[in-house]
Regions:
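Active-site nucleophile and cofactor-binding loops and adjacent substrate-binding regions
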Residues: 1, 132, 174-177
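Short amphipathic alpha-helical face segments that pack within enzyme cores
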Residues: 2-9, 25, 180-187
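An anion/pyrophosphate-binding glycine-rich loop and adjacent beta-alpha core
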Residues: 6, 12-123, 191-197
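Structural beta-strand/beta-sheet cores of well-ordered domains, especially the beta-sheet scaffolds
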Residues: 11, 19, 42-44, 91-93, ...
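Beta-strand segments within the central parallel beta-sheet cores of soluble alpha/beta enzyme folds
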Residues: 17-24, 129-130, 202-211
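A gly/ser-rich beta-alpha-beta helix-loop segment of oxidoreductase catalytic cores
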Residues: 28-42, 131-146, 318
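Glycine- and aromatic-enriched mobile tails/lids
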Residues: 47-70, 75, 84, 137-139, ...
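Accessory "access/gating" subregions that flank catalytic or transport cores
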Residues: 100, 104-147, 151-154
Length: 428
C-alpha cells in the first residue's frame, strides 16, 4: 500500500473504493500462499473435517465455481459451524484434487504440485490440501480516469492494482489480474507518453516547492530518528494486522468496524512516539516504522469506508446489512487525507451513471435476488435491448453493437483503436 499512501499523503490525490478487499478461497494453510482457481475449475472439491463436499449444499447451482467472495464466505461459515479441521495453527478445510489424476496435476497444475510439495510437504496427487481464505487483492486504489491519470492531481498516473479505474467494480473475477496488468500497462503507458509529449504539460514548478517537499520528508524521518518515545513499530503493525483480519475481514459488522476505526486511529497516533534505535547506514528499522504509519493511513481509509457503506456489495459483506442497495449505494467511495496532522481520512462519494453502462446492475446469477433495485436500471436495460435488437436486424456485427451501447474506441490511444483479435484466430 505504499503507492496508495504516497498519493494519499499528497492531500490532493484521492483513493477510491478502498473497502473493496477480495479474499481468495484457497490459500494454503497456514502459509497463505494461493493455489490457483484452476484447481476448482478443473474439478477440485472443497471438503470439511468429515470429508464431506459441502459446496453443493449451500450453492447448489455454482458449487465450487461460485465467485470468490461467495466461496470464501461459505468456507468461513462451514468452519464457524464446527466443521473445520483443527490443527496446530488454527482451523482449515480441505481442497481435494486427487480425483484429477497424477498426470493432469503434474502437467496442468504443476505450480500447485510444487507449492504443496515445497511449502507443505504434501503430495496433492494423493493427499488433500489444507486451505483457508486469504486476503488477496484490492479493487481500490488511486482514483484515476480512463487514461490512468489521477482525477485531482495532474501528472500522477497509476495502473494495475495500484489504481481504481473501474475495471473490476467491487469484485474481481478470477484470472483477470494479469489481464488488467497487461492491458493497463499498454494503455496507460501510451497515455503517459502522450502526456509527456505535450508542451502544455511541461513541468514548471518552483525549485522552492521541491525543497519544501524534501524538507517535509526529512522532518518525518527525523521525527523517528530523534524520538524518545516508548512505542514499538512491530507491535503496532502486528495489532493493525489483527484488527484488519478480525474486524474488516470476510464478514463485517458495524460495531466491529467502528471499533476498528477507533483503535486504528489510536495506533496511528502512537506512531508519533516510535523511536528508531539503530541509525547508521541502511536503516531497515527506520523503513519499517516509516511504512507502518503509511499502512495505518491506508487501513483507516479501508475501515472507515467499510463502516460507512451500509450495504453488502461484491467483496464487501456486512452481516447487519446483507442486501446490496443499488438505490442508495451505487456509488464510489472517495478517500482524501486533507491535512498532514489529520488522524482520519475524509470520505466523499461519486454516483455511478447507469445511463452509460453496458451492463446495468442486476441479479448476479446465483442465490436469492436480495438486492434493492435502482429505478434507472429497467430503463437502461430496455434501451440496451432495443438498440441491440435493432442493430442485429440491420446486420451489424458485435463490435459495432458494443460501441453503440458503450462507446470506448475513441477513448483509446490511436495505435490501439483497431480490433483486438489474434491474426490467426479471428473472433468473427
Amino acid at each position: 500500500g505504499t503507492g496508495a499512501a504516497l498519493a494519499l499523503e499528497s492531500g490532493v490525490a484521492t483513493l477510491g473504493n478502498m473497502e473493496a478487499i477480495q479474499f481468495h478461497p484457497t490459500g494454503i494453510f497456514p502459509a497463505g500462499i494461493l493455489v490457483t482457481e484452476g484447481c476448482r475449475g478443473d474439478g477440485g472439491l472443497l471438503r470439511d473435517c468429515d470429508g464431506h463436499r459441502f459446496m453443493p449444499d449451500v450453492e447448489p447451482e455454482k458449487k465450487e465455481l461460485a465467485s470468490r467472495d461467495v466461496v470464501s464466505r461459505r468456507m468461513e461459515e462451514r468452519i464457524a459451524q464446527g466443521k473445520g479441521v483443527k490443527g496446530r495453527f488454527g482451523e482449515h478445510l480441505w481442497l481435494d484434487i486427487t480425483l484429477l489424476g497424477e498426470h493432469h496435476i503434474k502437467h496442468n497444475l504443476r505450480e500447485v504440485y510444487e507449492i504443496c510439495h515445497y511449502f507443505l510437504g504434501v503430495d496433492p496427487t494423493k493427499e488433500w490440501i489444507p486451505v483457508r481464505p486469504a486476503m488477496h487483492y484490492t479493487m481500490g486504489g488511486v482514483r484515476t480516469n480512463y487514461t490512468g491519470e489521477s482525477r485531482t492531481l495532474k501528472g500522477l498516473f497509476a495502473a494495475g492494482e495500484a489504481s481504481c479505474w473501474d475495471m473490476h467494480g467491487f469484485n474481481r473475477l478470477g484470472g483477470n489480474s494479469v489481464a488488467e496488468t497487461v492491458v493497463a500497462g499498454m494503455i496507460v503507458g501510451e497515455f503517459i507518453a502522450d502526456f509527456c509529449d505535450k508542451p502544455e504539460n511541461g513541468i514548471d514548478i518552483p525549485t522552492s516547492l521541491i525543497y519544501d517537499a524534501a524538507a517535509k520528508v526529512q522532518a518525518t524521518l527525523d521525527g523517528f530518528l530523534h524520538n524518545t518515545g516508548n512505542e514499538d513499530a512491530a507491535k503496532i503493525r502486528a495489532r493493525m494486522q489483527e484488527i484488519m483480519t478480525s474486524k474488516i475481514g470476510i464478514f463485517r459488522r458495524g460495531e466491529d468496524m467502528e471499533s476498528a476505526v477507533s483503535e486504528l486511529e489510536d495506533l496511528l497516533k502512537k506512531t508519533y512516539n516510535v523511536p528508531v534505535k539503530y541509525q547508521p547506514g541502511a536503516n531497515s528499522e527506520l523503513t519499517y516504522a516509516y511504512r507502518t504509519r503509511k499502512m495505518l493511513k491506508v487501513a483507516l481509509c479501508t475501515a472507515l469506508g467499510a463502516a460507512a457503506r451500509k450495504e453488502s456489495r461484491g467483496a464487501h459483506f456486512r452481516e447487519d446489512y446483507p442486501v446490496r442497495d443499488d438505490k442508495h449505494w451505487l456509488k464510489r467511495t472517495i478517500a482524501t487525507w486533507k491535512n498532514e496532522n489529520d488522524t482520519l481520512p475524509t470520505l466523499s462519494y461519486e454516483n455511478l451513471d447507469i445511463s452509460k453502462m453496458e451492463l446495468p446492475p442486476g441479479w448476479r446469477g446465483y442465490g436469492a435476488k436480495n438486492y434493492i433495485d435502482n429505478p434507472e436500471t429497467p430503463k437502461r436495460q430496455a434501451e440496451i435491448d432495443a438498440l441491440r435488437a435493432k442493430m442485429e436486424a440491420e446486420g451489424a456485427d458485435r463490435y459495432a453493437i458494443q460501441d453503440a451501447i458503450m462507446p470506448f474506441h475513441s477513448l483509446l490511444p490511436k495505435r490501439l483503436q483497431g480490433r483486438n483479435e489474434r491474426i490467426d484466430e479471428p473472433l468473427e
